[in-house]
């Protein structure tokens, strides 16, 4: 029988951003993926279909396309991150149910994302839920090492002071 833990005793809640804190139906991750493909196509001067093949290969081998471009191409990540996260979020609706659910959770709430802090804030502000999160930990704070790598989690724990036990 699974062990239960009283919700009121949970001190820290950790949320991923993409397709987790916001609904997949928003297509935000798809919007970012389109921008990633555009970046790869421009970087390698190849058509979109070829760029998608390169993108998928880098993602599978390195955990993120960006990490693959950094290792194989010497990419400076800031331009990449700015480009791929430059998406329109003006059509996102306020999510009253999500707002209510977050308001009920005791303890600190954190976002842990392979995106950037500005990208996360852009989305959280659009949904009207930014005020619920004490901390946003991003790929920059993880030294550009993506989740699920152990280094990213160690940096997250170090930065937030969360006791993982």
Would you name each region that the model predicts?
Residues 7-10, 106, 164-165:
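A general structural motif
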Residues 97-106:
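Catalytic-core regions built around general acid/base machinery
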Residues 24, 111-112:
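Small/polar loops that bind or transfer phosphate-bearing groups
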Residues 110, 116-165:
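Substrate-recognition "cap/lid" segment bordering the active-site pocket of phosphatases
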Residues 3-15, 20-97, 118:
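N-terminal helical cap/lid subdomain that shapes the substrate entry/recognition surface
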Residues 71-74, 105-109, 161-163:
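Short glycine/proline-enriched coil/turn segments at helix->beta-strand junctions
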């Amino acid at each position: 029988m699974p062990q239960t833990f009283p919700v009121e005793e949970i001190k820290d809640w950790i949320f991923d951003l993409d397709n987790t804190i916001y609904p997949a139906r928003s297509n935000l991750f798809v919007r970012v993926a389109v921008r990633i493909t555009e970046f790869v196509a421009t970087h390698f001067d190849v058509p979109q279909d070829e760029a998608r093949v390169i993108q998928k290969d880098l993602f599978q081998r390195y955990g993120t396309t960006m990490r693959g471009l950094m290792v194989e191409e010497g990419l400076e990540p800031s331009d990449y991150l700015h480009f791929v996260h430059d998406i329109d979020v003006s059509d996102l609706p306020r999510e009253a149910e999500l707002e209510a659910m977050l308001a009920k959770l005791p303890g600190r709430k954190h976002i842990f994302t392979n995106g950037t802090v500005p990208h996360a804030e852009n989305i959280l502000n659009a949904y009207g839920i930014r005020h619920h999160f004490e901390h946003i930990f991003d790929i920059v704070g993880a030294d550009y090492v993506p989740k699920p790598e152990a280094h990213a989690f160690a940096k997250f724990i170090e930065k937030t002071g969360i006791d993982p036990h």
